[in-house]
Design a protein with these regions (language model features):
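Domain-scale signature associated with acetyltransferase and cell-envelope carbohydrate enzymes
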Residues: 1-105, 129-131, 138, 148, ...
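Extracellular/periplasm-exposed beta-strand and loop segments of Gram-negative cell-envelope proteins
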Residues: 108-109
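Short acidic, glycine/proline-rich loop/turn micro-motifs
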Residues: 114-117, 180-181
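Glycine-rich NAD(P)-binding loop of Rossmann-like domains
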Residues: 116-128
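Residues immediately N-terminal to the Walker A/P-loop in ABC ATPase nucleotide-binding domains
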Residues: 145
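A generic "structured core" feature
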Residues: 151-157
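H-loop (His-switch) and adjacent beta-strand-loop-beta switch element
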Residues: 153, 169-170
Length: 191
């Protein structure tokens, strides 16, 4: 009981201080549950909008850069160690659930064989509809549009358009080989 009360006071203080610091760019309903280790960062002219009754578990890390916008609907839950990197726009609907370790990037580095990886970024909007379940360790890439009532299975890497009412899952193929004594030695010695 005391712990819950302290967490409510902590969240109200955290929201109030961020509203003072960022002004209109930080539009967050007062009824939230932020873990003390949840990190919300706004850079430059970035904006953050969060609806009521949203929960952020331990280790969540959300960064909004430049003129980027992060908009999260109400009654949405982010499990442990979720990450969002928004340089353009990420929109998450209401009544969504994100499993542990979900990563969302609306940006990607530019690459060429001549110059290698550049710090310049390519960006594209991401939208996630209402009533979606994004399972553990899913990676959502720039330009992804997920409709309402979708389930994205654990470990998927998604991009592109996913229509409403879709279950997305990936197939992992495991191969098994028996190791005999000769193979063990070859493996250990590198022969």
């Amino acid at each position: 009981m005391l712990r819950s009360l302290l967490l409510i006071v902590y969240n109200l203080m955290r929201i109030s201080l961020n509203k003072l610091r960022f002004g209109k760019r930080f539009a967050v309903h007062w009824m939230q549950r932020f873990s003390p280790s949840c990190d919300l960062k706004l850079f430059d002219h970035a904006q953050l909008f969060i609806g009521r009754n949203t929960e952020f578990a331990v280790g969540c890390d959300f960064e909004v850069h430049g003129d980027g916008v992060l908009h999260i609907g109400e009654n949405t839950y982010f499990n442990r160690y979720c990450m969002i990197s928004a340089h353009q726009e990420v929109r998450v609907g209401s009544h969504c659930m994100f499993g542990p370790g979900v990563r969302i990037f609306d940006n990607n580095h530019c690459f060429s064989c001549d110059r290698g990886v550049s710090s310049r970024l390519k960006t594209d909007r991401i939208t996630i509809g209402d009533h979606c379940w994004i399972a553990a360790n899913v990676i959502i890439l720039k330009g992804t549009h997920i409709g309402d009532c979708c389930v994205i299975g654990a470990g998927c890497i998604v991009s592109g358009d996913i229509p409403s009412g879709t279950l997305v899952r990936c197939r992992h193929e495991l191969t098994y080989t028996t190791i005999d004594n000769r193979d063990k030695e070859a493996f250990v010695t590198g022969d």
